[in-house]
Design a protein with these regions (language model features):
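Carbohydrate-active catalytic/glycan-binding domains of CAZyme proteins
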Residues: 1-309
Length: 309
């Protein structure tokens, strides 16, 4: 901890442990919160850590809920994404009472989603008082340029879940997780971009003082290297209360508060369908025309559109 953000910081101790076995568990604080029989039965498997069911204690993100309670969401692959409350006076963990029915472990906290060593990591929770939802952002895939790294989002009306996607579902240990979660960004290319964005992930998000909402993440490119670059993109909320990432890094753009005339919307659009796959495939745009008569025309799709107040 430190009295100032610039530091210096003083070591106060560990918050949570993972990766131990039956011989090293005594060097952790696990047995301060659960009995040894429970710990060895559940947290240890085949003389090693039970990474299929319990979390990897990395990728922490600390936030405050709508009632100013302090929380830490964490986890990477392994047993999934977990949530623990923190004491705002000390930053130390407030370990909950076990509640197996609601996926609450006395040491690791509330399991939110994932498990089975599925590629879900880098959780970040942001509360939006306008929509009344907590948004849980996670990354799927691996962070190399060929790893299909991408950002998904789930939401909940309560800080401890359930966090669900646009279909009202969430991934558990025994499902194909790529089918779950609203995909915000992955590998994609637009005509004005010199290189495709690759492995876009491990994000945070924030709402600025002017109410604009942003996604912050790192990306690689299809340039034959693993060099990466941070990016900040504005997000807009659709009418169903889901964030939609704008395709270009922010340049201070502002969306009109009063909307747009129909004539301003008519025209040619480059449309990207990112799908739900986790791969090194690059989503390339197709061209669609929004016509003044309300029709949508293109080689890949057709339909209708309308402007609403």
């Amino acid at each position: 901890t430190s009295e100032t953000i610039e530091g210096p910081y003083e070591w106060q101790g560990a918050l949570i442990y993972s990766g131990f076995d039956k011989d090293t568990i005594a060097g952790t604080d696990v047995l301060d919160y659960v009995d040894e029989e429970y710990a060895l039965k559940n947290y240890v498997r085949n003389n090693g850590y039970n990474f299929e069911e319990y979390p990897n204690a990395i990728d922490p993100s600390v936030f405050y809920d709508a009632d100013d309670r302090m929380w830490m969401v964490y986890g990477s692959w392994s047993g999934g994404i977990y949530l623990l409350e923190l004491d705002p006076a000390t930053g130390q963990v407030i370990h909950p009472e076990a509640d197996e029915e609601h996926n609450v472990d006395a040491y690791y906290g509330k399991k939110l989603l994932g498990g089975g060593h599925k590629s879900i990591e880098a959780p970040y929770i942001l509360y939006d008082e306008t929509t009344g939802y907590y948004y849980l952002y996670v990354s799927y895939g691996t962070l190399t340029s060929s790893g299909g790294y991408q950002v998904r989002v789930f939401r909940s009306k309560t800080v401890d879940g359930d966090y669900v996607d646009m279909n009202g579902e969430y991934p558990t240990a025994d499902v194909d997780h790529q089918l779950y979660g609203l995909k915000l960004t992955g590998n994609y290319k637009l005509p004005s971009l010199e290189r495709a964005y690759m492995a876009t992930g491990h994000n945070s998000a924030f709402i600025d003082e002017d109410g604009k909402q942003y996604l912050v993440y790192h990306t690689r490119f299809n340039n034959g290297t693993e060099n990466h670059s941070p990016r900040v993109h504005q997000m807009l909320m659709n009418e169903d209360g889901w964030p939609c990432e704008l395709p270009y890094q922010t340049q201070g753009e502002t969306v009109s508060d009063t909307g747009y005339e129909t004539d301003a919307v008519v025209g040619r659009y480059f449309v990207i369908n990112q799908g739900t796959n986790i791969s090194n495939d690059i989503a390339n745009p197709v061209i669609l025309y929004l016509n003044a008569d309300g029709t949508v025309v293109g080689r890949e799709a057709e339909g209708t559109w309308e402007a609403v107040d």
